[in-house]
């Protein structure tokens, strides 16, 4: 099963809902898809809701995803993605790593990213207002 993104441009941010089964290759593919939407919509904030993703990424997969994401954002400025774009990821365990390895690796490459366990905290960090139709993402 592949990862599927539902992307919508909201007032001031891009809202991305991801479903399916995690794999490193699929995560890289969908990250590029998300960056293309950022450039197309000229938005500087992304709310990535991955609470419906399934899988348990291995240590090195977390590292390689963080490295890929950080480098890809840095290299995407020529495609219209600002290096100051903020990315808030909302994930459940085991997709969300308590050690935040992927987040730390991406941060070390200049990406503005933070991982959360709830939507409200992510919206607060992005400093954007909630939108009524934002899905709970956790099946509730």
Labelled PLM ranges:
Residues 2-140:
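Amphipathic, Lys/Arg-enriched alpha-helical "gate/interface" segment within cytosolic domains
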């Amino acid at each position: 099963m592949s990862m599927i993104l539902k992307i919508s441009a909201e007032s001031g941010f891009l809202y991305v809902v991801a479903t399916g089964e995690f794999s490193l290759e699929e995560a890289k593919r969908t990250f590029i898809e998300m960056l293309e939407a950022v450039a197309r919509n000229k938005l500087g904030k992304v709310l990535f809701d991955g609470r419906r993703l399934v899988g348990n990424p291995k240590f090195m997969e977390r590292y390689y995803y963080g490295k890929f994401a950080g480098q890809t954002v840095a290299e995407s400025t020529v495609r219209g993605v600002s290096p100051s774009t903020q990315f808030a990821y909302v994930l459940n365990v085991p997709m969300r790593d308590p050690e935040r390895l992927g987040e730390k690796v991406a941060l070390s490459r200049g990406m503005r990213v933070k991982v959360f366990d709830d939507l409200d905290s992510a919206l607060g960090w992005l400093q954007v207002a909630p939108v009524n139709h934002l899905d709970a993402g956790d099946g509730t």
